[in-house]
Amino acid sequence: MKKHTDQPIADVQGSPDTRHIAIDRVGIKAIRHPVLVADKDGGSQHTVAQFNMYVNLPHNFKGTHMSRFVEILNSHEREISVESFEEILRSMVSRLESDSGHIEMTFPYFVNKSAPISGVKSLLDYEVTFIGEIKHGDQYGFTMKVIVPVTSLCPCSKKISDYGAHNQRSHVTISVHTNSFVWIEDVIRIAEEQASCELFGLLKRPDEKYVTEKAYNNPKFVEDIVRDVAEILNHDDRIDAYVVESENFESIHNHSAYALIERDKRK
């Protein structure tokens, strides 16, 4: 066994690099960590998030200190919100002695929903991503991305068929760059209200009849969904920029239908 000595251990990451090439993003990816996320009902949800954490690296340094990313994450075990997300990002940039940083936090988020007729309650899960970025030492930007599962029913199929119409589950993905607070639930409702019908975790027979007929009476192409969502986002002053996507997992094809609208309202 080697004896312990007081001699300093070499800091290889902090040594100079002679290639003179800066790195835009370096850090850790796909690390899981338990978090508390605030919900609109005044409570909080215990969940597990997957983090990607990066900083930029100047051309004159060989490497970054990977262990510090984990230390920063472990030091923030309290409730994570839009506001505290900025604090974590600034802490990372400061600790890693960088002027730019990027954090992505992806987690399942649950909403307790009531069935439309019976009122029976059940949970439905959504995939949410918080994205925070600091550029040039001070410029902070926050984006929230929510993937909302919905039902879409084809207008063409309804029009040309003597009875019935093909329908399928779809994903409406909304990414919003905000200037003030927006609840996750607010984004979910925007997507669900513009679909042919929303989804529920549990339905009784009267509920199933209702959602089937609602979708049939509200047919939407992917083009309709993204345009209808974009129209709502265009009139929401809390949102500076957005990307809205719709992907229909076609029930009569072995491919998806897809549409996207991207707008920066500041330009």
Curated annotation (Swiss-Prot):
Signal sequence interval, chain numbering: none
Keyword Ribosomal protein attributed: no
UniProt keywords, alphabetically: Hydrolase
Catalytic reaction list: GTP + H2O = 7,8-dihydroneopterin 3'-triphosphate + formate + H(+)
Site (May be catalytically important): C154
Gene Ontology biological-process entries: tetrahydrofolate biosynthetic process
Any one GO MF annotation of this record: GTP cyclohydrolase I activity
Record EC number: 3.5.4.16
Pathway linked to the protein: Cofactor biosynthesis; 7,8-dihydroneopterin triphosphate biosynthesis; 7,8-dihydroneopterin triphosphate from GTP: step 1/1
Stored Pfam families: GCHY-1 (PF02649)
Protein's UniProt keywords contain Hydrolase: yes
Biological role: Converts GTP to 7,8-dihydroneopterin triphosphate.
Family: Belongs to the GTP cyclohydrolase IV family.
Name the record gives this protein: GTP cyclohydrolase FolE2
